[in-house]
């Protein structure tokens, strides 16, 4: 049983092991693990693909756009005429990759778009709906679907992984990503703009600010900093963030800091003062007041 994927490509569906890339069959599903140097890989006429980068980096190139990917990120690519992964320095990548064939994708869309009665009357129906997934790299730690990919990747290093059913794993991931991104589209509609395309582009930039906050929560984060990384003006960022998330960036940052601080306090390894300092609260009185405002109890209530 394979638990070390160094310099190989393993497909959980076929149990195939190779040392070189190969063209994927349009009619097949794949759940692949690879930990190998890879300079490039062209995927022409591609199926829906979900890629989680545990380690490594590179760039996905379509005809009309390019997207950089990095460690602990995942991305969903919609069916299209194809794209190419490029890694000029051929640095090793550690990747979990799930490919959903057209038939399974249509079955999934049928399940999501029809009533229970319709599914009982026609249990094997299919619906051909254009995939709507955001083709943007997302931090795995910040989304339920990303955390699921992390768990599957971790489990794939254990011998018991080979007892799992790859189709069920793929269906689980597809459902989770659909729920996350459906929720994302609902949030995008809160952006004050007339055109859906403008709402979506603004939301994509807000996601950059959102992930930046989560990745740097132990550091001071200014509105100017968020505006710079998201390529939104301060006013546009402030207004759109408030409409989408129901609070200003500053309020969101403080709530997240306090939530993380609560976790540290419950672990019992640091004093309340040390935890407050860790998250940038220099005045323990201010920290305790904000903490009680959010949770209704002082920090000491959560000490073991």
Positions of the model-derived regions?
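Hydrophobic residues in alpha-helical segments
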Residues: 156-159, 177, 213, 253, ...
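Alpha-helical structural elements of signaling/regulatory helical domains
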Residues: 140, 158-161, 215-218, 267-271
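An amphipathic alpha-helical interaction segment
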Residues: 126-196, 201-204, 208
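Basic/polar phosphate-binding segments, predominantly the helix-turn-helix DNA-binding elements
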Residues: 179-184, 190-200, 208, 212-258, ...
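Hydrophobic recognition helices of helix-based DNA-binding modules
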Residues: 108, 173-181, 241, 265
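N-terminal regulatory/effector-sensing and dimerization cores
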Residues: 2, 18-127, 154-164
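N-terminal presequences and immediately downstream first alpha-helices
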Residues: 1-11
């Amino acid at each position: 049983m394979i638990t070390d994927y160094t310099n190989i490509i393993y497909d959980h569906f076929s149990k195939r092991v190779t040392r070189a890339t190969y063209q994927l069959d349009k009619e097949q599903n794949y759940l692949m693990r690879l930990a190998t140097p890879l300079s490039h890989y062209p995927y022409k006429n591609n199926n829906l693909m979900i890629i989680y980068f545990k380690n490594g980096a590179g760039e996905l190139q379509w005809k009309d756009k390019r997207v950089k990917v990095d460690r602990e990120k995942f991305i969903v690519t919609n069916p299209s005429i194809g794209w190419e992964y490029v890694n000029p320095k051929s640095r090793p990548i550690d990747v979990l990759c799930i490919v959903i064939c057209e038939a399974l994708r249509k079955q999934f869309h049928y399940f999501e778009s029809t009533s229970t009665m319709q599914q009982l009357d026609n249990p094997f129906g299919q619906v051909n709906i254009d995939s709507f997934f955001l083709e943007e790299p997302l931090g795995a730690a910040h989304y339920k679907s990303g955390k699921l990919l992390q768990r599957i990747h971790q489990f794939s290093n254990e011998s018991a992984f080979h007892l799992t059913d790859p189709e069920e794993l793929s269906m689980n991931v597809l459902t989770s990503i659909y729920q996350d991104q459906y929720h994302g589209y609902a949030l995008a509609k809160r952006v004050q703009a007339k055109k859906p395309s403008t709402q979506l582009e603004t939301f994509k930039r807000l996601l950059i600010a959102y992930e930046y906050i989560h990745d740097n929560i132990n550091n001071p984060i200014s509105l100017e900093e968020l505006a710079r990384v998201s390529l939104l003006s301060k006013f546009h960022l402030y207004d759109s963030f408030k409409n989408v998330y129901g609070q200003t960036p500053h309020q969101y940052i403080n709530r997240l800091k306090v939530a993380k601080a609560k976790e540290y306090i419950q672990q019992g390894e640091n004093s309340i003062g040390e935890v407050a300092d860790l998250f940038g609260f220099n005045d323990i009185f201010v920290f305790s007041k904000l903490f009680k405002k959010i949770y209704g109890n002082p920090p000491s209530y959560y000490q073991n």
